[in-house]
Amino acid sequence: MIVNRFSAQFLSMTLAAFVAVLFVAIPAHAQDAATIYAQQCTSCHGAKGKGDGPAGQYLNPKPSDFAVSLKGKSDDWIAKAITGGGSAVGESPVMPPFASLTGDQVKALVDYVKHLGS
């Protein structure tokens, strides 16, 4: 019984340390970008940026696959698409603008979607 209690405590402490290391290893802006993406983008663009989110199937035109749509695009172009919506960059007006994001959030999100598209 003492061994089982020790094992449970050791496992709990090891798991807590592992989770703490994960959050330290991932830059804060990347964590923020992942959260923003999950809340604002996943429903249309999908978790992996393939344009296959659950709401995306009902949109016309379909949401873009970042691997295709971001190829050759500058960070400024991507930021403008995020803050101004699709029509701000000559793309689908179905994508809404996210003008309330801070500059740091937009930069982090640009990096995040570029990573998804790579």
Q: Which residues fall in each region the model found?
A:
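The canonical Cys-X-X-Cys-His
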Residues: 37-47, 109-113
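Short, solvent-exposed loop/helix junctions and linker helices
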Residues: 30, 71-72, 103
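Gly/Gly-Pro-rich "capping" loops immediately C-terminal to redox-active cysteine motifs
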Residues: 34, 50-80
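Axial heme c-ligation environment in periplasmic c-type cytochrome domains
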Residues: 57-67, 83-116
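Electrostatic cytochrome c docking/interface patches
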Residues: 21-36
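Extracytoplasmic/secreted proteins, especially bacterial periplasmic and envelope-associated proteins
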Residues: 32-36, 77, 104, 108
